[in-house]
């Protein structure tokens, strides 16, 4: 009489998962707040797409970053009913 014994693992296999990764945050968002002074060239808002549109004295980079074109004070405003824009208004020199 011949016996055929098979021993099975008492621990399940390790398996695999498709999780376990994450990327660093992209540091998007407001860099200059409403009412803050900004010099020409300063970044005001970093974004992907146009959450906020450029207004007076504000330019838009090819990565949609908004930056000041002139020295002044930053103002976040409404553009129509459902859009927002940011402008930089020059301040008169007090002498």
Swiss-Prot record:
The N-terminus is cleaved by ribosomal processing cysteine protease Prp. Belongs to the bacterial ribosomal protein bL27 family. This is Large ribosomal subunit protein bL27. It comes from Pediococcus pentosaceus (strain ATCC 25745 / CCUG 21536 / LMG 10740 / 183-1w). The keyword Ribonucleoprotein applies. It comes from the Bacteria. Residues 1-8 form a propeptide. InterPro entries: Ribosomal_bL27, Ribosomal_bL27_CS. GO terms for biological process: translation. GO terms for cellular component: cytosolic large ribosomal subunit. Residues 1-34 are annotated as: Disordered. The keyword Ribonucleoprotein applies. PANTHER family: LARGE RIBOSOMAL SUBUNIT PROTEIN BL27M, RIBOSOMAL PROTEIN L27. GO terms for molecular function: structural constituent of ribosome. Keywords: Ribonucleoprotein, Ribosomal protein.
């Amino acid at each position: 009489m011949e016996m055929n014994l098979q021993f099975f693992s008492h621990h399940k296999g390790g398996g695999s998962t498709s999780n376990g990764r994450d990327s660093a945050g992209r540091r998007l968002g407001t860099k200059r707040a409403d009412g803050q002074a900004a010099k020409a060239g300063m970044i005001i808002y970093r974004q992907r797409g146009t959450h906020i549109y450029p207004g007076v004295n504000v330019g838009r980079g090819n990565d949609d970053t908004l930056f000041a074109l002139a020295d002044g004070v930053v103002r976040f405003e409404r553009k129509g009913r459902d859009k927002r824009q940011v402008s930089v208004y020059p301040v008169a020199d007090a002498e």
